[in-house]
Amino acid sequence: MGFMEIVLPVVVSFVITAIAGKLLIPALVKLKAGQSIKEIGPTWHMTKQGTPTMGGLMFIIGIGLTIVVLGWKNMMAGSFVHLYVYLFALVFGVIGYIDDYQKVKHHHNTGLTALQKFVLQLAAAVAFLCLMRYEGMLSPNLYIPFWNAYIVLPWVVYLIFAAFVIVGTVNAVNITDGLDGLSSSVTVPVGLFFLVMAVVWPGFEQLGVFSGALVGGLLGFLVYNHYPAKVFMGDTGSLFLGGAMAALAFAYDMPLVLILVGIVYICETLSDIIQVGYFKLTHGKRIFKMAPLHHHFEMCGWKETKVVAVFTAVSVIGCVIAYFAVYQRFSF
């Protein structure tokens, strides 16, 4: 990929997303699409009550238009992998939109039930995996970072594993979306990691267009989502991002890299699981002051901006480690 091929998707997506925000936020305010805040969260978060949600539509639009405008040559040549990744993420975005719509409609912080979300997400994951296998883009050879080796799995085992990873990733990103600018800031380095992969790894230029558009879209969204946020991405945005992260990892055929680039998502999710499990086992005791992890640090006295900065730095470190973990794969 040349310099312009790297930069252009970022810039175009940033501009489109920023413009979309100017139009979308007033519309969301007019429609009274305000976020309902959980009463079990930090009390000072109640001041965020009514902030427009579903803002993820901004970068979904920005990314979509960018890959159509800049990726049409690849599509004319019969290469659709970047479009598949986008459409897969979009399906999760639609699931999130339905959830957000239910919350806004009923003015409550509960939308779809956990079972409804799981069934829809699992169906989307299976459909994506079947499409990728049909197109010859999926392999049961599981790449192991650092060792530059593969574990050959039976197809059935691999597909079950892959579906679990996809649904888990999507929900982990969703859990991370709890502070102004947190999920978007943490995901920018991950998008950059996948963009770098497209630059150094011949044959993945199409994914570079999507990854660049993802980075630009998130930066455009942060114009409005940084503290104090004028808009939240909602489940519309967070489920889209989770779908995008999972789809990119499988499109590059290295899903285990998510352990490194998604270290923040994993820590957030584990803190939630550990807190709930320990609470039940000990009949009311807690390990963390509040879960997920970003709320724990808030309760320790950290400002939102500090939590976001530190978590983003951890994400950057995870992505740098991930680069060296897979370096041997493309350094031949």
Where are the language model's segments positioned?
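Alpha-helical transmembrane segments
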Residues: M1-V29, F59-Y97, F128-E135, V156-F332
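Short aromatic-rich membrane-water interface segments that cap or initiate transmembrane helices
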Residues: Q49-T51, P145-V157
